[in-house]
Amino acid sequence: MEMKQISETTLKIMITMEDLEEHGMELKDFLIPQEKTEEFFYTVMDELDLPDNFKNSGMLSFRVTPRKDRVDVFVTKSDLKEDLDFNDLSDMEDYSGLSPEEFLKALEDNFMDKGDIEAHHKLEEHDKTLKEVDETMTEPAKEVAEETIREDYTHYVLAFSDFDQVVTFAQGLKNVSVEGSEFYKLGDVYYMTILLYLADEPDYYANNMYARFLEYANVADRTRPYLQEHATILMEEDALPVLQATKWS
């Protein structure tokens, strides 16, 4: 485990999957308010050398963000003299087994306002490069450059009518790896952006993968820039791997 102080009131604790396993924890344990989760946080706090201003500081709130190979826990202190508040993790009732609905509820509660904003590097670099091409190149040169960029990367926006369809999509693509993925909600519709790296693949790879995606998803009627501006982002990176790795009941 590693700890980094972000500000006077916020710590970031990075917990590897090996750390979780050693403590008998799973990713889904963070999605419900239960005694096991509370005990784990007390244990982590005992094991780490907390800054002095976090010791006996009153109420602490926790926000959990799953990553591809770890869990990031953001610890925020307040001046209220109360016990640890674990309600920030979720407001769901106890359940037996993780259902898609419960997982989605936890995502909406915990992730859409998270403060650890890390750019979705590959997609952002792709968009930035295309923008620079637009602004600096003549039309013939621009066409050649854009074609070269698209040969290396392509991205798709997929739509899902409900969260069950998202789960089916992730389960149906268990063995598929992508360069990047984001997960959004807009109204009652869910969206996922998928970035594919094409440089080492045959010419037909992109079309084959898109056809495979559409076996489980729908063609989106929104672009990624539109979703970035208007939709709620539930996972801003590694959305597909996280959903693939989750065990559904």
Curated annotation (Swiss-Prot):
| One function term, GO molecular function aspect | protein-macromolecule adaptor activity
Cysteine disulfide partners in this protein: none
Subunit field text: Homodimer.
Its family? Belongs to the MecA family.
Query: What HAMAP family does its record include?
Result: MecA (MF_01124)
The entry's free-text remark on domains says:
The N-terminal domain probably binds unfolded/aggregated proteins; the C-terminal domain interacts with ClpC.
The function of this protein is:
Enables the recognition and targeting of unfolded and aggregated proteins to the ClpC protease or to other proteins involved in proteolysis.
Would you tell me the protein name for this molecule? Answer: Adapter protein MecA
